[in-house]
Amino acid sequence: LAFGVKARVVERAVLRGASLEIPPGSLVVLAGENGAGKTTLLRLLLGEAPDAGEVAVPPGRRVAYIPGEREVDLGEAPILEAVYRRLKDVGAAIEVLNRVGLSDAVLYRARPHELSTGQRERFRLALLLAERPDLLLIDEFAAHLDVPTARRVALGLGKLCREAGVTLVAATHRPEVVAALDPDLLVYVGYGGLTTVPRRGPRT
């Protein structure tokens, strides 16, 4: 996907002439302070119209989005049942839960409100990954997790996305999350523009 845009929030230009190309299957981290424009950038990728320029996401791509501060209704069904409803395959549902670190058989029967904050964060990921997205957008990834948990979740998510060929764009201001994700591209968002830093060589 690729774009070149200008976007405003309440008459203040958040992004000016921003240009970025993201190869399919890449892991990209948007870094920057709160209010720098990371959420605006994700919303543009999600389909919000820019004030100028264009955002080009290949047609037919499945896009999944985890918002930042807003709580998402995770339902009342046991977590294994909830993932199974999306995949229609018990084995595949168990595999997805295992990959995000929810591998305890007791947890399979737990309902979302019975989970810890970190477990709910991982369950949200499991639900979206069960939709088999081509592009996964996450705002303020792992914002409410302690450092060790944030690292574990980031490591697991990065590995899962690489294995499944999912393009990931995650916004964060936490350096330990950036290090754990080990992205292909680090994009600093601020001062109305973007600064890109490649971090990985070609994949083998």
Locate each region found by the language model.
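Walker B catalytic motif
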Residues: 137-141, 145-148
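Helical segment within the ABC ATPase nucleotide-binding domain
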Residues: 150-163
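ABC ATPase nucleotide-binding domain signature region
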Residues: 27-95, 190
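Conserved H-loop
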Residues: 165-171, 174-181
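Conserved structural motif at the start of ABC-family nucleotide-binding domains
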Residues: 14-17
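Conserved hydrophobic segment flanking the Walker A/P-loop of ABC-type ATPase nucleotide-binding domains
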Residues: 21-22
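ABC-family P-loop ATPase nucleotide-binding domains
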Residues: 3-9, 66-123, 127, 131, ...
